[in-house]
Amino acid sequence: MTDWRIADVWEAIARKTPNRPALIQGQRVITWGQFDARADALAAHLVAGGVSAEAKVAAYLFNCPEYLEVYFAAFKAGIAPINTNYRYGGEELVYLFDNADAEVVVFHAGFADTLEAIRSRLSKVKLWIAVTEPGHPAPAWAVDYETAVADAPPARPVKAPWGRSGDNLLLLYTGGTTGMPKGVMWRQDDLFNVLGAGGQAARGVEPIESPQGAADRLDPEGPRPPLTMVCCPLMHGTGQFSAFITLNQGGAVATLPSRGFNAVELWNEVERLKADGVVIVGLAFSTPMLEVLEVDPGRWDLSSVLSISSSGSMWSQENKRGLLAHCVNATIFDSFGSSEAVGLGASASTPGAEAATAAFVLGPTCAVFTEDGRRVAPGSGERGLVAVSGFLPIGYYKDPEKSAKTFLTLEGQRWSVPGDWAEVNADGTLKLLGRGSQCINTGGEKVFPEEVEEALKTHPHVRDAVVVGVPDARFGERICAVVEPDGAVELELADLSAHVRNRLAAYKAPRELVVVDSIGRAPNGKVDYKASRARALKSLGLEG
């Protein structure tokens, strides 16, 4: 099939197994039949609300069942869903919604005050829909989400006047390495294919050949399809795409009841639900998960866990070994990719055979190229940029210049080259070296240093500032501010962090401070980031 429409697949599954769970959060369970009906009602509400065929629907939500209902509704209506980082501040949200041409924003009502302050600047938004919660009713200018999904329309499934197509988009906004968020444009057909076309090779599940094929392989009274505990945010590609892979098989996606990650709660839920899959992002999750298991080994029955999957952040061989000691039936899958390049590489770890940190097997459609377009030969020691071909995004939304820099024609075919440097070992495996830019990856969140530097430099007593990443046992890296003061007062980390949090998302605020006499910029105004980081490491006692 060459025109996959994700809603068609999910609707076929809902018809076959309407009483099976699709979405779980704590004691709340949305069956496949309810998932389909609620998404139909929301899709009808969007179409009746006057959205255009090019509409974008922003999900400004914490993890919750409504998140995936919004995506299902957008797929049904043939319009594009977009993710929204719920940690963003007002200015970041204005940029994102304006850049995306968002016509609908579905938000947790707890964000109402933030949106109220910027709503007048978002003239493109036609519909505001609030997911209410205790203490946070829908504001007067928004529709209550439950009102929007209360009644499924008589004509189902819902389709907009412009219909559905495999060309319908999903926009995945990523902070990336070059400043403000960029919207990666995935055609539904390409996305469905790159995510396994309804299959999952790691579990031996074959791709399907038609939407009905997804339903035909399900038995309402037979073995349970996958139940995946997605611990990381659905607003990021790792969580979102992992959820899609599970739903494409007719499985259930479970999210944690709490807003923040709690390892004890995770293992409680895994045991209660007998989850067979767990999705995380590297050290920020695996470290606390392992710590609570080590404190009380044997507390939980984790025999149901068959896979622990991670992508978006490197994590250690030691953590993999530790988790496998407690999840004895599991395989750990560590994937290397990005929003614009799915499937660059992967590693699989089993008890006694744990993959090393940053070691990956190249994907079947991947290669490593030098900057002048030559393939890197295995064992040559030459460094190059990892690239993937096959099913790729169209490019970045409204940014042809950046699209041209990332999506290249090499050896006569189109490749996505997101900027990750690597060497190819003699056995063909990949040794990942990292992103060539100065982007800082802290717990899976990408932070662009210049953005934080500019915020720091608005402080009345900061003359100049540079931001670097320093090692962090849990988050991979943490933000360090190297600051040149004006000399009037003694700068304090708490004050500078609060200053940044007032302007940017909290995860971008510095957690370390190094005060210097001079930043030491070159005559052209540029700074030596390598030297700045070395200076920070020395000052913090982290060198060597």
Describe the role of every protein-language-model region:
Residues F192-V230, M235-D276:
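Conserved AMP-binding/adenylation subdomain of ANL enzymes
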Residues E146, N248-Q249, A275-I280, L290-E354, ...:
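Gly/Ser/Thr-rich phosphate-binding loop
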Residues T2, N19-C64, L68-F72, G89-V94:
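Conserved AMP-binding/adenylate-forming core of the ANL superfamily
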Residues A152-Y173, M180, M185, R217-L227:
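Conserved pre-ATP/AMP-binding loop-to-beta segment of ANL
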Residues A48-G49, I79-A150, V489:
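Structural core segment of the AMP-binding/adenylate-forming
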Residues Y88, V94-Y95, E103-F107, N268, ...:
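AMP-binding/adenylate-forming catalytic core of the ANL superfamily
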Residues T31-G33, L169-A197, A201-I208:
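Conserved AMP-binding A3 loop
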Residues A367-A387, V424-D427, V489-L493, D528:
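Conserved beta-loop-beta connector loops within the AMP-binding
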